[in-house]
Structure formats: structure tokens, C-alpha cells
Amino acid sequence: MIGYKTLRKINKRLKAVKKEKAGRQLSPVRRIERVYPVKNRRICAMTFDDGPSAAMPSPQVNNSDLGLTETLMRILKAHNAKGTFDIIGTTAENYPDKRGKLHTASWGGMKHDHYPDFEMDHLAGAVNQPQLIQKIMQSGHALTNHGYHHILYGPINYVYRQRETYHNIYEVVEDLYTLHQTVKNALAIDMKFARPPHYIDRIKDGFDAYDAYALMGYQYLAASFDGGGWQPTTGHYDEDVEAMVRPLEKALLENPEALNGQIIFQKDGCNMSLQTPIVDALPKQLALLAKYGYEVVTVDELVNLSPFEDFGEGMLYFEAARALDRAGFIIGYKNNTFQPNRLLTMGELITMATPKTIYTAKCEAILKGDRKGKASKKAFGIHIDHHIHYARQEGYLGRMGTIDPEAKVTLEMMIDFVSAISKVKGNIEVTVLEPTGETYTRAEALPILEQLLV
């Protein structure tokens, strides 16, 4: 059997290939695992998966009757830190099932996950623990969507090959929507980020997590640093705790800026051996971060300050990019880069003037869709054709005929595009800056689009 370390190495290589490919496509959904460091600050975020949990920590904390999630919140408060809790709805409906083997990835169940443990589902999830999601928000933390049932979006070999999965995008969106509405009805908030169970993106019918998140209006919540606490025990609890602390300590010793702008993965649950080393490791991790001058904030705050991985404060036209992003336009690549010096194509110019709402408007159609037939990737998937159609429908293309999405944008093309949008919006005045070269870079388009759209 292939070991976890080998699988993680393979996965790391695959992620690098996928990330490079994702850097070629502008997308309403960006995979956010880190951001460009905020100027004059050391700042990072921590996410806590699979709760909220009222189960007691294991081993239990002395002189405390708090469940796991409240224990984590107490620790965060003591260190003036804010967390992002990546919550589930409930796994209580994931039966019939059989208990999995302890110390393995199937510890909670053979067909499905069960949190906090098999036949103890009532102790975790927003549905079963509504008071906990309320306390999370009241304490200044954030909530993100980890799936109502925490069922895999699609199959994966090796570790989860016996798991049952969703079959199509209808089921995935329904699952996300159900948890979204559960939280909205309870707290009057709209979650903005989601993370697929076990990071499995592909859905059996050809769609993927990005398509589903576009329909929901989410960004893809990833992570760039593993806080640990999920692997099987070494047989010694204290060693399990130190195994969570050492990598972070090593990273900061080698480079005090190593965690700046990063998102750290944590568990709001037990490891594969039904223990919670997070309880004793988290205070040490937070103390280390404080020693090096870090602020630990919610993912919402981190991304609001610095939306992209390669483009940030102090760079020419960054403020315009942030304004357009906050206004909901599709301006970043799928891998969360902006690539300011890349030459701008006509397809990208059109996309950057397209709001993400063209996808969320289709969510109701998916929820009410005929489940007997396969959903159309052309109709509901992320594609530049939707952006061109939107631009034409809005009158943004004026009298332009056939569009070549790969054509580099010249001054003449920019003037035609700006003139058409200006006319649609009531002849607003726009200063069109000339490109420094023969055609525009992506950054050079930003102040022009900001004048038009924000």
C-alpha cells in the first residue's frame, strides 16, 4: 500500500502542474491558498475544518467542561487571534455505514465521514450545534462552507476508493446551498468561501468545484501551510503535539516572513486516532507567530486586504485591481494570480468587465433543474463564451463583429471598447491611458476599467 508521505509527494507535484495550468484562465472562482504580503505587516489566517464540535477534547483538558470548538475559541482569544471555521452541516444522514479502521483515513466510516466520530454525529455540525456557530460569529471569527453532508464531490483512488460520492453538479450545489441557507437563516450572513471535502474537485458529470462555487458566489478556500493534527498518532501524545509545532517553528527560524500572507490548515476535530493534539499545539503555534510579530486574522479580512498572490500594495494600479475585485468583477486567474505585466488579450479585457453575478444568476436553475438529464457544461460551466455573450447583450462591444479572444489589445481596440461601455452608461468621461508598448498589459487596463465600472 502506498504510504501517506508518498501520496503527499505525488499530490504536491500534481498541484504544481494544476496551478500552472490554472494561471492561464481568468475565473470568477480563485483558489486562494496565500496572498501577497500586506505592506508593513506580518499577517496570516488559520482555518479549522470539520466542526463545529461539542465533543470533548481527547485527552480532556483539566478543569474544563468546554467542547472542542469552544476550547479552540478560548485559545484564540487568549492570543488575540481570529479563526476561520470551515464548517459542515451534519453527517448524521450518512448511514447506513460501517465504522472504519482506527489510525487510517477511514477511521470515521467506510462509505462516508462522520464527525466528530462514528455514531456521534449529533455532536458536530451547524445543524446539530447551532449555538456554536452563533458563538463563533459573536467572537469575531468567520464561517466558511465545507459541505452540508461532507460527501466527496467525486471518486479518488488509494485512500478513499471505497467512499460513496455525489454524482453530478445538481447534488453538489444542493449540498452547498443547504448549508449556506442554514447559516443564513440562523445568523443573517452569506458565507463567501468554500472548501471541498478532502480537496477533491472533480465531479463525475464533468463539472468541478470551481463550477459549483461560481454558481454559489464563493471563492475556493485552500491552504498553503499544514498545521497538522490530522494524521495517526505516533503512539506518544506529546510527540504528536510537537510534530505540529516543529514545522512552523522551523519555517519561521529559516525565514521570519515565511508565513506572511499564508493560510494555515487546522482541524476542528480529532486525528485518525481519535485524539485532538490541536488543543495543546495551537497555543504553542500562536505563541510562535506572536513572537515573530504576526497577526492572525480571518480569511475574509486577509483577502479583503490583499486579494491576489502576486500583486499587492505598493505596486502600480493595485488599488484599482482591489476596487474592481471588491466590486465583483472577474479580474484574477484561477490560481489567484493577477500577472500584472502579462499582455492583455481581448478575451481577458471582456472578462475583466464581466461581473461574477452572471454565474450566481444561474444557481436557481441548477437547484430546480431536471435531475434526469445531465447538466450542460456549456450552459452552467465557467467559460469565456458567457463573458462575450454578456458583453454583447449589454452593448459593450458596440458594432464589433467577430471577436478574437486571443488578440492583443491595442490603443484603438481599447478606445472602441471604452467608447461602447461609456455610451451604455450615459456617456461618462474616461481617461484612456496609452499603453507603454504596442499593446496593453493587464495592469494598464485597470485604471481605465475602474473609471468605467466602479
Spans of features found by a protein language model:
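Active-site beta->alpha N-cap acidic-glycine motif
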Residues: 3-196, 288, 303-307, 312-314
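Soluble non-cytosolic domains of exported or imported proteins
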Residues: 42, 54-55, 59-70, 123-127, ...
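Sec-exported extracytoplasmic/periplasmic mature domains
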Residues: 53, 77-81, 137-138, 177, ...
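Extracytoplasmic/secreted envelope proteins and their assembly/folding machinery
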Residues: 69-73, 84-85, 129-133, 173-176, ...
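Conserved beta-strand edge residues that scaffold enzyme active sites
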Residues: 90, 150, 227, 303, ...
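Short acidic/His/Gly/Ser-rich catalytic and metal-binding motifs that mark active-site loops
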Residues: 94-96, 151-157, 229-231, 359-363, ...
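Catalytic domains of cell-wall/extracellular-matrix polysaccharide-remodeling enzymes
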Residues: 123-131, 135, 148-265, 269-290, ...
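N-terminal propeptides
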Residues: 305-454
